[in-house]
Amino acid sequence: PIAGSMVLAAILLKLGGYGIIRMMQIMPTTKTDMFLPLVVLALWGAVLANLTCLQQTDLKSLIAYSSISHMGLVAAAIIIQTPWGLSGGMTLMIAHGFTSSALFCLANTTYERTHTRILILTRGFHNILPMATTWWLLTNLMNIATPPTTNFTSELLIMSALFNWCPTTIIMLGLSMLITASYSLHMFLSTQMGPPPSNNLTEPSHSREHLLMILHIMPLLMISLKSELII
């Protein structure tokens, strides 16, 4: 059920990040070097999850692994126990909650029309449903963390915090963000570009689907304009 996936990615997955925040309060704040293996594991997990995304042919699995990779960045940012890291982790949890929920919603609208989640079989929607293609583009740009979205603010905070804490982490951070951009563009091109399905009568977009996407995207843009509400 798509509602379960949306709630799982947007809310329940972020409870793990909240648990890390609470656990870090009882850890020493001075000797953060002891957390270096945990930070490396979190970032390496994010890179591996991103590489797994590149191998996926199932649209829903790709979005699910994308959520895991972003939580790796959140975990690394929270573990170092700096104000910027904590702000970036919390902001990314909120931003990616909206983004992953929107991606699952779009995947479901595609599935309702094609009855398949295989990427190569869902192509050609830019000619049939141009408005849905616009939503796909905006949501993937949010997933890549392009300005002026809240995702950009959060990833900038996380990158600054981790780089100030240990400059070497920029290697895995940069690799993770590069792969994120790669699979996001791959997901957009695979689902929207190419020849449309010839034997499939596609029903038009409904207003409720557009309203759902507006309610996912508008909060992110509004929060980025007044980011001091979170940071």
Curated annotation (Swiss-Prot):
Q: What is this protein called?
A: NADH-ubiquinone oxidoreductase chain 4
Its transmembrane ranges are: 1-21, 34-54, 63-85, 89-111, 118-138, 156-176
EC number(s) per UniProt? 7.1.1.2
Q: What does this protein do?
A: Core subunit of the mitochondrial membrane respiratory chain NADH dehydrogenase (Complex I) that is believed to belong to the minimal assembly required for catalysis. Complex I functions in the transfer of electrons from NADH to the respiratory chain. The immediate electron acceptor for the enzyme is believed to be ubiquinone.
Any one Pfam family here would be: Proton_antipo_M
MF terms in GO: NADH dehydrogenase (ubiquinone) activity; ubiquinone binding
Where found? Mitochondrion membrane
Reaction(s) catalysed by this chain's protein: a ubiquinone + NADH + 5 H(+)(in) = a ubiquinol + NAD(+) + 4 H(+)(out)
Q: Which keywords describe this protein according to UniProt?
A: Electron transport, Membrane, Mitochondrion, NAD, Respiratory chain, Translocase, Transmembrane, Transmembrane helix, Transport, Ubiquinone
Q: Which family does it belong to?
A: Belongs to the complex I subunit 4 family.
The Gene Ontology biological process annotation of the record reads: ATP synthesis coupled electron transport; electron transport coupled proton transport
The coding gene here is: MT-ND4
Q: What InterPro entries is this protein classified in?
A: NADH_UbQ_OxRdtase (IPR003918), ND/Mrp_TM (IPR001750)
Looking at the keywords, is Mitochondrion present? yes
Q: Which GO terms describe its cellular component?
A: mitochondrial membrane
Q: What is its membrane topology?
A: Multi-pass membrane protein
